[in-house]
UniProtKB/Swiss-Prot annotation:
Component of the heterotrimeric retromer cargo-selective complex (CSC) which is believed to associate with variable sorting nexins to form functionally distinct retromer complex variants. Keywords: Cytoplasm, Endosome, Membrane, Protein transport, Transport. Acts as a component of the retromer cargo-selective complex (CSC). The CSC is believed to be the core functional component of retromer or respective retromer complex variants acting to prevent missorting of selected transmembrane cargo proteins into the lysosomal degradation pathway. Retromer mediates retrograde transport of cargo proteins from endosomes to the trans-Golgi network (TGN). It comes from Danio rerio (Zebrafish). This is Vacuolar protein sorting-associated protein 26B. One of its GO terms (cellular component) is endosome. It is found in: Cytoplasm; Membrane; Endosome. The keyword Transmembrane helix does not apply.
Length: 331
């Protein structure tokens, strides 16, 4: 046997028990690309196998224990190196000793709490992953496998429309209305704009969907605004009494649910920004926050009962009967 057991090393592979049947979804990585990951919901069990393959047959691998962890953590990019863990579960797979041959270890994390949605933003990343580690004297051997978590909501009981009047005194007076204040990610924003007074020459009007990511607290707060969509309402001059309909489909845009004060580290909010431009290129705008949520087609046949029970309800809504949840819905 070589000194300190350096002559032997190993490869680790993590395989989920339901890897062949579990759904995969695309998720943005830190470099802006997209990869596919296994999808989980709050309350679902995470189980599988850790395969340890010795690279050099006939040589033993000394170790100080083998373990697997399930971790949920938040990383703020301006504070790299400090990972804020909000879920940390550990299973010991083997006590300190030696491995004389390749070996497979089973693991199971039962009904795991996954309170937040996976998110990769401009200044923050929230991720869930499994990490298997062979502890050694000087250099541990480890392998990570990321998963994606999505949070589900039922229909909010209170979902009032948005009605506002905006304008410039004696020049412009507009009344606009959106049919709801809370929309699921594949919803349609329906509304109208009514011109009560028009004494300036408007040449263009649009609605923008603005995503605002806020990270940090106190003096160290960072805001990142990103225009997700631009929807042209009109190109030309409106007249008094004119009413313009709005119909904006959200399904074609890449958005997440609204995330408020996640673990006291960050928020993601969405706004409808009504923009008017006059012939002198002056811009007038009015912003209104909306809430986005992931529609819980809560009981699809492919979804486990435990995930159904754990599916998150929209905050502030009252629990609905289980029978109501059991209706299959299509996006």
């Amino acid at each position: 046997m070589s000194f300190f057991g350096f002559g032997q090393t190993a490869e680790i592979d993590i395989v989920l028990n339901d890897a062949e049947t579990r759904k995969k979804v695309e998720h943005k990585t830190e470099d802006g690309k997209k990869d596919k990951y296994f999808l989980f919901y709050d309350g679902e069990t995470v189980s599988g196998k850790v395969n340890v393959t010795l690279k050099t047959p006939g040589k033993r691998l000394e170790h100080y224990g083998i373990k697997i962890e399930f971790v949920g953590q938040i990383e703020l990019y301006y504070d790299r190196g400090n990972h804020h863990e909000f879920v940390s579960l550990v299973k010991d797979l083997a006590r300190p000793g030696e491995l004389s041959q390749s070996q497979t270890f089973d693991f199971e994390f039962t009904h795991v709490e996954k309170p937040y949605e996976s998110y990769t933003g401009q200044n923050v990343k929230l991720r869930y992953f499994l990490r298997a580690t062979i502890s050694r004297r000087l250099n541990d051997i480890s392998k990570e496998m990321d998963i994606v978590v999505q949070t589900l909501c039922t229909y909010p009981e209170i979902n009032s429309s948005i009605k506002m009047e905006v304008g410039i005194e004696d020049c412009l007076h507009i009344e606009f209305e959106y049919n709801k204040s809370k929309y699921h990610l594949r919803d349609v924003i329906v509304g109208k704009i009514y011109f009560l007074l028009v004494r300036i020459k408007i040449k263009h009007m649009e609605i923008d969907i603005i995503k605002r990511e806020t990270t940090g607290t106190g003096p160290s707060v960072y805001h990142e605004n990103d225009t997700i969509a631009k929807y042209e309402i009109m190109d030309g001059a409106p007249v008094r009494g004119e009413s313009i309909p709005i119909r904006l489909f959200l399904a074609g845009y890449e958005m997440t649910p609204t995330m408020r004060d996640i673990n006291k580290k960050f928020s993601v909010r969405y706004y409808l920004n009504l923009v008017l431009i006059d012939e002198e290129e002056r811009r007038y705008f009015k912003q209104q926050e909306i809430t986005l949520w992931r529609k819980g087609d809560i009981v699809r046949r492919s979804m486990s009962q435990q995930a159904t029970i754990a599916a998150q309800r929209y905050e502030g809504s009252n629990p609905e009967p289980t029978s109501a949840q059991a209706k299959e819905e299509t996006d």
